[in-house]
Amino acid sequence: MSTEHMEELNDQQIVRREKMAALREQGIDPFGKRFERTANSQELKDKYANLDKEQLHDKNETATIAGRLVTKRGKGKVGFAHLQDREGQIQIYVRKDAVGEENYEIFKKADLGDFLGVEGEVMRTDMGELSIKATHITHLSKALRPLPEKFHGLTDVETIYRKRYLDLISNRESFERFVTRSKIISEIRRYLDQKGFLEVETPVLHNEAGGAAARPFITHHNAQNIDMVLRIATELHLKRLIVGGMERVYEIGRIFRNEGMDATHNPEFTSIEVYQAYADFQDIMDLTEGIIQHAAKSVKGDGPVNYQGTEIKINKPFKRVHMVDAIKEITGVDFWQDMTLEEAKAIAAEKKVPVEKHYTEVGHIINAFFEEFVEETLIQPTFVYGHPVAVSPLAKKNPEDQRFTDRFELFIMTKEYGNAFTELNDPIDQLSRFEAQAKAKELGDDEATGIDYDYIEALEYGMPPTGGLGIGIDRLCMLLTDTTTIRDVLLFPTMK
């Protein structure tokens, strides 16, 4: 280590490095080796929950635990400390006469943040706290930096997001939130696996952005000297697998969109897309409700979910409403009536709904009305279906009214949680939709996509009637952990 670097260290860091050197002099590796424990903190608490101090003493049971040293007190020949593992904390009670002088020195010189292994007798203190009375201490790893001053509840938001490891050490609530996230994803997998779906993996690097209306990240493949994009959706590759006969597939994975950041948006996020052959959007509506209710039940139990003080009846059947009916109910405007684009624009002007340059069809105006007036009213789980063809380039037209598609979005607390439809499997219709998207792109719609001719070719080999679904995992995790910002459910959110 250079003198220059040593001068950058504070007193605590210097002392910790000196202790590291002292351990080496004693023949102890400061960064340890494999250590076998017999239980974690919670397993011990569960196992001995019903035994008092005397009963534990009579049982004379032993255990071996390991964890990070997070508290330490005592002096002379006796010390108390707490070790923290994945499940929580447990107290250790160390006596010099029980572990020996040399072993006691290891404990005595251990700093907060160090990892220790402890073998000993399971006991309960006079205060009733389950503890391990040490018979041997093993040094497992040296922490060369002290934990932050207020590590029992890190509060600096910048540090929480940039140094998530410190947040996880210090904030049990945060730690449990990410455990819950993991469980939600596991339960979604379990639900779909039990229904015969296959989990698959599709490329992250695409030649053409597609499957969603979003601006992509662009990168360059040096060996082939071609520009590529990070995927904005997994849709088109998953539907190729339906063409290939896989019938029921899903993928949980990262999606990348080169767009703004706010409380519910991060440039990279996790979604699940699900495709089922021989199904339509009504079947997928049932599937979506089942997935979300199963995930909610697994982490919140059978009842409703409380989100920021609002009771969300996630355990009850979700409301289902056509987009046009929802608009009519709130604004009085009836888009079931046939009208020209100019007539629709006039109604928009009257209602002060902004009209963009690329709004070339009545369907664009209908969607703008929905976003302006309806979205903010959708608190309880609501399936809004019947989106206009103009804003649904991959969805099948409704056979009874060709202006609209067999598509739905799920809204909860005014936010979209899922998007699904009966998939468009007519390659000729699909090509014309792609061409309309390409035209919108030329008119300034930077979320419109180009034409994926390879996907058109796949459809020409025949795709069965199919229902498809996309759910934003991060937003679902926010809902089920009562979190207001997406950064609190992403272990490593995007930072400047």
From Swiss-Prot:
Binding-site positions, Mg(2+) 1: 409, 416
Example of a GO MF term: transferase activity
Cofactor(s) needed by this chain: Mg(2+)
Gene Ontology biological-process entries: lysyl-tRNA aminoacylation
UniProtKB keywords: Aminoacyl-tRNA synthetase, ATP-binding, Cytoplasm, Ligase, Magnesium, Metal-binding, Nucleotide-binding, Protein biosynthesis
Disulfide bond entries: none
Catalysis: reaction(s): tRNA(Lys) + L-lysine + ATP = L-lysyl-tRNA(Lys) + AMP + diphosphate
InterPro entries cross-referenced by the UniProt entry: Aa-tRNA-synt_II (IPR004364), aa-tRNA-synth_II (IPR006195), aa-tRNA-synth_II/BPL/LPL (IPR045864), Lys-tRNA-ligase_II (IPR002313), Lys-tRNA-ligase_II_bac/euk (IPR034762), Lys-tRNA-ligase_II_N (IPR044136), Lys-tRNA-synth_II_C (IPR018149), NA-bd_OB-fold (IPR012340)
Residues binding Mg(2+) 2, per UniProt: 416
GO annotations of cellular component type: cytosol
Entry keyword annotation includes Methyltransferase: no
Subunit: Homodimer.
Listed name of the protein: Lysine--tRNA ligase
Species whose genome carries this gene: Streptococcus pneumoniae (strain CGSP14)
Gene responsible for this protein: lysS
